Amino acid sequence: MAKVSQRVKKIQTKVELRPYKGTEALNLLKELATAKFTETAEAHISLKIDTKYADQQLRTTLVLPKGTGKKVRIAVVAQGEKINEALAAGADLAGAEDLIQNIMKGDLDFDRLIATPDMMPAIAKLGKVLGPRGLMPSPKSGTVTADIKEAIDEFKKGKLEYRADKSGIVHILFGKTDFSVEDLLANLEAVQESIDKNRPSGVKGRYWKSFYICSTMGPSIQLDISEFRDKVFS
């Protein structure tokens, strides 16, 4: 059994086993982010859904108002003038069949792949390469579109795709630990509002089960769900 480091033991003792209010929890998250790099702020939300049923699945996107704190590398598969349009809009890579061939060879130096609709038949063969990495373009995630500029702008600003896993848990980042508490709170509230707005139609009764946040190397901190949800529904 792996030994728990003294650093981990020390920070774990600072977290009480109770729901925290948002600002209090975020201050604690920042205090306990003591790694030698800027940690990511993560949210882990357990929902009372059974994703084996189509009407209880949750998969959607949102734009974090304060961004992710991460530099997103974007590749675009398009043709003709759309390639120049993509590069002018800030794409890091853009091409047609040449880019597809590079991806087939394992060149995946990007975080998000956007494609124009006319290129989807050609991209279909990349399913085995992109699918397991969550990089396959799809209309639902906003990565298949003719409006290349808008898509690039949104993902550069902090657009994320999230889904509930087979256990009904949503795992999503909401910034970096060097963000201000106010900015982290704004992003976290956006996450909560998006999950409520996109409540699956098949869910009856209670929806939220638990709401935890943590930093990359930090302990889990339980949030008071009612504090966030009351702001929306009061």
Curated annotation (Swiss-Prot):
A Pfam family hit: Ribosomal_L1
Domain of life: Eukaryota
SUPFAM superfamilies the record matches: Ribosomal protein L1
Cellular compartments annotated: Plastid, Chloroplast
Cited CDD domains: Ribosomal_L1
An MF annotation (GO) of this entry: structural constituent of ribosome
InterPro entries given in the database record: Ribosom_uL1_bac-type (IPR005878), Ribosomal_uL1 (IPR002143), Ribosomal_uL1-like (IPR023674), Ribosomal_uL1/biogenesis (IPR028364), Ribosomal_uL1_3-a/b-sand (IPR016095), Ribosomal_uL1_CS (IPR023673)
GO annotation, cellular component aspect: chloroplast; large ribosomal subunit
Residue spans crossing the bilayer: none
Main location as per UniProt: plastid
Annotated GO biological process: translation
Listed Gene3D superfamilies: 3.30.190.20, 3.40.50.790
Sorted UniProt keywords: Chloroplast, Plastid, Ribonucleoprotein, Ribosomal protein, RNA-binding, rRNA-binding
HAMAP family: Ribosomal_uL1_B
Quaternary structure and partners: Part of the 50S ribosomal subunit.
Family membership noted in the UniProt record: Belongs to the universal ribosomal protein uL1 family.
PANTHER family named among the record's database cross-references: 54S RIBOSOMAL PROTEIN L1, MITOCHONDRIAL (PTHR36427), LARGE RIBOSOMAL SUBUNIT PROTEIN UL1M (PTHR36427:SF3)
Function per UniProt: Binds directly to 23S rRNA. Might be involved in E site tRNA release (Potential).
Record's protein name: Large ribosomal subunit protein uL1c
Organism this protein belongs to: Rhodomonas salina (Cryptomonas salina)
Organism placement in taxonomy: Eukaryota, Cryptophyceae, Pyrenomonadales, Pyrenomonadaceae, Rhodomonas
Annotated gene: rpl1
